[in-house]
Amino acid sequence: MSKKSKKIDMLNGSLWDKMIVFALPLAFTGMLQQLFNAADVMTLGRFVSNEAMAGVGNNVPIIGLIISFVMGLALGANVIVARCLGMRDDAKANRAVHTAFATAVIFGVFAVLLGEAIAGPAMDILDVPDVVRSDAEIYLRVFLLGFPFIAIYNFLAAVMRSQGDTQTPLWALVAASLFNIAGNLFAVMVLGWGTGGVALATVLANAVAAGLLFVKLLKTEGALHLDLKQLFKIDREALKPIVRIGWPAGLQGAVFSVSNLIIQAAINSLGPAVMAGSVAAFTVEINVYCFINAFGLAATTFVSQNYGAGNLPRCRRATWVSMGLNFVATFMMIALVVGFGRELLSLFSDSAEVIELAMTRIYWVVLFEPISVIMETVSDAMRGYGYSMPPAMVTLICVCSVRIIWVWTVFAAYHDYIVLMIVYPVSWAVTAVALCWLYYRHQKILEKKPRFAKQTAEA
């Protein structure tokens, strides 16, 4: 790996050390992305009110739905650019880079228009209590104005990730996070703008992150170079696989968010304290998922490059090495979050009741995250092969059906917070089993392809 270019040779040599170098900055990037929400929640919880904090928390599933979808689309760009690099076709990779940027801008603007139109009805669907509705709707409407910047950042980060550069997006987000924290405090403590001011600071911070990556790629030479004259030039040959792979991946992420909307509505029926506790716990627990997601994306990128190079055995090794490293990282994060949970939660609220309710969620969600390791790794590995729609459909059917049935039957019968939280590990387990079966079937299909028949026979 070259320090200057920050590229990683995914086609040769050992895998585990390169995956760690690839995944750790990506995990920290994910944590910093969550820090945007955490900074907003902490600022409002500490300097405004628990109601303001709960109002922002009600938007987490909605914002998560849109962001999950754009990250899924960006994954399509990651896979295609990585495959082109594996094939040593820099010209094709560059066309995909410009297509990815144009797609990000178009989707970002569309998301703003759609989001602003449904912001009010979304509050009704979630049955947001009147006491927090004003804060929730103000935050969502202002936040959505910055969505084009979120889309641009995620697509450009995916492009950089395709050649192993996960450090530049991290440092861009570090700068943006510092800006966000300072902006939040200035908006609330100096200007007294409350929820709207906090949301505006987040919009500007997202613009900083996107702008830094944009400038970086303008100055980059080679396959990933952005040319101002071709920014909105869409190559149909590149767009089709980006959408074909990215659309199902985005759908899968959105499915989780839709199911979380259903769970959020159930949480809202349990009162403001439970709402605040759930928000605080989610803000802490999501950091565990950042590591799971990072090593899953490592599987996607390493598999994609090696699949482009025609090396199926190395694709398989990349999948299992990624899963092993993922387990190690996840268990370490679980120990940290569970061991220091109360101390971390005290940053969001000084209410003993809220903290205990938050710990309840952490016990029932975080301790079962290893199931997610299996689910995410096999799903992300299949996307690296360009096999994206089937994993998305399996997730759609398993996650949504289990969670909807659980909320409408088991939770409806007992109406208890713990009963509601149990739906997370149950839905993960069902989905993980189904995805493992799908992965096995897909590998058998690959073995029959002429380009891989000799490799699998020798293995």
How would you describe each model-predicted region?
Residues 1-23, 81-146, 188-247, 303-368, ...:
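Short alpha-helical transmembrane segments in multi-pass integral membrane proteins
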Residues 31, 35-54, 123-130, 186-193, ...:
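Helix-terminus/linker motif at the lipid-water interface of multi-pass membrane proteins
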Residues 53-113, 150-169, 277-341, 372-395:
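Small-residue-rich hydrophobic transmembrane alpha-helices
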Residues 38-42, 113, 121, 155-159, ...:
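Alpha-helical transmembrane segments of multipass membrane proteins
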Residues 22, 26-34, 71, 103-112, ...:
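Hydrophobic alpha-helical transmembrane segments in multi-pass membrane proteins
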Residues 21-40, 142, 176, 205-209, ...:
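Transmembrane helical elements of multi-pass membrane transporters/channels
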Residues 10-48, 61-76, 80, 105-112, ...:
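N-terminal transmembrane alpha-helices
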Residues 74, 143-161, 169-180, 198-213, ...:
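Short runs within selected transmembrane alpha-helices of multi-pass transporters and secretion channels
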